[in-house]
C-alpha cells in the first residue's frame, strides 16, 4: 500500500518544483537556440574562408565546444526535473488506482 504521506510528499514536490522545472526547460531551449548564434559568431570571425571552412572552424572552436557543455548541463537539469515530476505523478496515479481498487473490493463484499 502506498502511504498517504508519500502522496502528500509527491504533491508537495510537484507544487514546489514547478517553477524550477519551467526555468530548467526555458534555459534548455535558450541554450539550444543560442548554439546557432555561437556558430554564426564563430563563422563571422573567418570571413576570409569559404563557407564550408567557416562552418568547420566554427564547430571546432573553443567557444562552440564550451557551449556544447552548457547544452549538456541544461539538458541534464531539464531531464532531472522532468523525471522527478514523472515519478511524483506516477506515485499519485498508483495511489489513485490502489484506492479505487480498494473501494470496489469494499462494495463487492
Roles of regions detected by a PLM:
Residues 1-19:
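Short, charge-rich amphipathic alpha-helices with coiled-coil/heptad character
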Residues 3, 17, 51-53, 67, ...:
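Generic alpha-helix initiation/capping and coil-helix boundary signal
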Residues 28-56:
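Extended alpha-helical coiled-coil "stalk/arm" regions
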Residues 1-4, 104-109:
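Short acidic DE-rich linear segments
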Residues 47-76:
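Short, glycine/alanine-rich amphipathic alpha-helical segment
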Residues 25-28, 32, 36-37, 69-102:
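Long amphipathic alpha-helical coiled-coil segments
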Residues 10-11, 61, 97-105:
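Short A/G/S/P-biased low-complexity tracts
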Amino acid at each position: 500500500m502506498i502511504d498517504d504521506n508519500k502522496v502528500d510528499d509527491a504533491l508537495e514536490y510537484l507544487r514546489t518544483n514547478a517553477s524550477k522545472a519551467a526555468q530548467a526547460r526555458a534555459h534548455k531551449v535558450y541554450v539550444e537556440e543560442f548554439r546557432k548564434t555561437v556558430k554564426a559568431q564563430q563563422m563571422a570571425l573567418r570571413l576570409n574562408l569559404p563557407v564550408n571552412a567557416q562552418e568547420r572552424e566554427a564547430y571546432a572552436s573553443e567557444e562552440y565546444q564550451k557551449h556544447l557543455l552548457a547544452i549538456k548541463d541544461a539538458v541534464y537539469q531539464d531531464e532531472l526535473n522532468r523525471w522527478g515530476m514523472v515519478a511524483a505523478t506516477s506515485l499519485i496515479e498508483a495511489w489513485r488506482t490502489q484506492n479505487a481498487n480498494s473501494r470496489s473490493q469494499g462494495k463487492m463484499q
